[in-house]
């Protein structure tokens, strides 16, 4: 197990938050506390057509989110941050086998990344109250 404190922040982007999310201010505050205490911070950002294109305002991280010097960034195109990205290579290169995860959306991208990370042998801790989602209609 690594001794570095590693925090992975998923999809805390302007475009993602165009849909209202639960307790945004509290969630961001807790994430900022985590990133300030971390040795390594990895920001995961989703890209897709329709407002989340790389370089767009929608793709950018929330302005109130603390981005420490030396933070690492991974761009993804699917819910799972490991799928067709350089995340696993980055973790291997950095000697990271465990991390704390937080961000948006609890029931989609955070969940998919946790499941796929654990299946690859990573030890993942979910930061309580440092993840959020939107109201979603129940399936019919």
Set out the residue ranges of the language-model regions.
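N-terminal nucleotide-binding beta1-loop-alpha1 segment
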Residues: 8-11
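Active-site-adjacent betaalpha module
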Residues: 1-6, 30-36, 40, 52-140
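Long, well-ordered, tryptophan-enriched scaffold segments
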Residues: 44-45
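Short acidic, Gly/Ser-rich segments with clustered Asp/Glu that frequently serve as metal-coordination loops
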Residues: 13-19
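Short glycine-enriched, charge-decorated loop/helix-capping segments at active-site entrances
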Residues: 20-26, 51-52
């Amino acid at each position: 197990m690594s001794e570095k404190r590693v925090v992975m922040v998923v999809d805390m982007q302007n475009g993602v938050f165009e849909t209202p999310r639960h307790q945004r201010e509290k969630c961001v505050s807790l994430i900022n506390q985590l990133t300030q205490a971390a040795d390594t911070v990895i920001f995961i950002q989703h890209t897709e057509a329709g407002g989340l294109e790389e370089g767009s305002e929608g793709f950018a991280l929330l302005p109130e989110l603390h981005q420490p010097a030396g933070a690492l960034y991974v761009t993804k195109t699917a819910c799972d941050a490991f799928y067709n990205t350089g995340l696993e290579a980055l973790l291997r290169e950095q000697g990271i086998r465990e991390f704390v995860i937080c961000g948006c959306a609890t029931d989609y991208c955070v969940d998919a990344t946790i499941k796929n990370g654990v299946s690859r042998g990573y030890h993942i801790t979910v930061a309580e109250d440092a993840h959020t989602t939107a109201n979603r209609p129940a399936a019919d």
